[in-house]
Design a protein with these regions (language model features):
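STAS-like cytosolic regulatory interaction modules
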Residues: 1-58, 64-102
Length: 102
């Protein structure tokens, strides 16, 4: 008879790095970031979208923050953006998991 072992799942340590989407197309950037959220443990993450224009940055940060909130309700995303206008534009859509830095 084979003895069954007990296994515990441990959280992997959080890596500290900045994720930069490899596309200026906002739909592709959303897919890239959301894929990262789904496939990796990233309760706290940092994303650089400072190369995007204001409207694209608003779209990407809103859609991906929502996806991140669904998986990690207590998580946080730090968005590196090119303008304070992104934060102002998204303030009414905020879920409490986003921080914007210049």
């Amino acid at each position: 008879m084979k003895k069954q072992g007990k296994y515990m799942l441990n959280k992997l340590p959080q890596l500290q790095y900045t994720l930069t989407p490899n596309s200026v197309n906002p739909a592709e950037a959303v897919d890239y970031i959301n894929s990262h959220i789904e496939n990796y443990y990233c309760e706290t993450m940092s994303v650089d979208i400072s190369y995007m224009n204001i409207l694209d940055a608003c779209r990407v940060s809103t859609l991906c923050s929502t996806q991140h909130y669904i998986k990690y309700p207590n998580g946080k995303i730090t968005w590196k953006v090119s303008s304070d206008s992104v934060k102002e534009f998204n303030k009414d859509l905020e879920l409490g998991n986003s921080e914007y830095i210049l």
